[in-house]
Amino acid sequence: MPRPAQALTPIAPGAAAAGPRRLDDFRSARHETQEGGRTIITEPGRIIVRDPGGQEFIRHDETDRFRFGARDIQTQVVGGETRTIVIRPDGTEIITVIGPDGQLLRRIRRDQQGREIIIIDNSYRDPLAVGGFYVDLPPPNIRIPYDRYIVDAGDASPDLIYDTMEAPPVDRIERRYSFDEVLYSPSVRMLMPSIDLNTINFETGSWEIPPDQAAKLQVIAEGLNRAVTRNPREVFLIEGHTDAVGSDIDNLSLSDRRAEAAAGLLTQQFGVPAENLASQGYGKQFPKEQTDGPSQINRRVTVRRITPLLNGGTASLPPPPPGIAPPR
């Protein structure tokens, strides 16, 4: 299971990252069980689920990213829910509520005056939705140039990066989607433009971002900070993708850890608020280049604005006063 929130301690700015940084360090620690027809694979910090149809997804506890620069971290367990409160030096609090199964339920920012902004409300369920977290939508009707729909960060200007982070959905959004529906439904994510960054050179089997590669995230960070300054309720998904070399489980774990590493670096080195980021790995499931061999194009980190998906397309409106919940 992901490490419980009770084990979290603050990390001072500038402190070196601890723990393993390569898959080889804990591959032998994986444990596989069967539960209700599903295969559950646990490894340090991650749970991988394979459903009866062979589809796999990965889940991790994102509260670990919030330790950086925290003044204090408090944990409360009420009714099976774990409530982690990260207190920053300026008195701002980031509150993360996790369900008994490790599912993120809510993420809230509380300012020094006690006013709250709900950033993620994953407890929402559409009354007409059927089944679990997977939503199957028809392909969106894309009316913008393809290179504005999937932007290559290496060729894009800072203005295009920022414009993409502010861009509306490419097609009509019929309803609000829960956070998990966004994470696990590619057809939902396809409603939003994205930015691909495939120039970070990770070592094989590692998710550590070398110092000489970190600067490649600067233009992304500047766009994120501009967008969050404009609307403090923005949420951006940092996606990790691999090529097809290696096992499915290794690729899923590696991509998830690389996405989390990129999100962490955006906060630690460039000051992007951790609460406005989420990370998720998809392994080799969504290649840009159809090949079973090594592919630099497929080994990439993708940044995608998901705010309109979470609130039903109202993200372009000015944020309501602090303490007002997003529309249902």
Ranges and model annotations:
Residues D212-A214, E234, H241-R328:
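Periplasmic OmpA-like peptidoglycan-binding domain that tethers envelope proteins to the cell wall
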Residues M1-I173, S178:
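Extended interaction-bearing regions that mediate binding to partners or small molecules
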Residues I40, T75-V77, V86, V188, ...:
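Sterically constrained small-residue positions within well-ordered secondary structures
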Residues G53, E62, R88-D90, G99-D101, ...:
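A mature extracytoplasmic/lumenal domain signature
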Residues I118-I120, R125-V235, P308-R328:
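Periplasmic peptidoglycan-binding/tethering modules of Gram-negative envelope proteins
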Residues G45, G80-T82, G91-E93, G114, ...:
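Envelope-exposed proteins and targeting segments
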Residues R67-F68, Q103-L105, G114-E116, D126-P127, ...:
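Short, low-complexity, polar/charged sequence segments that are solvent-exposed and flexible
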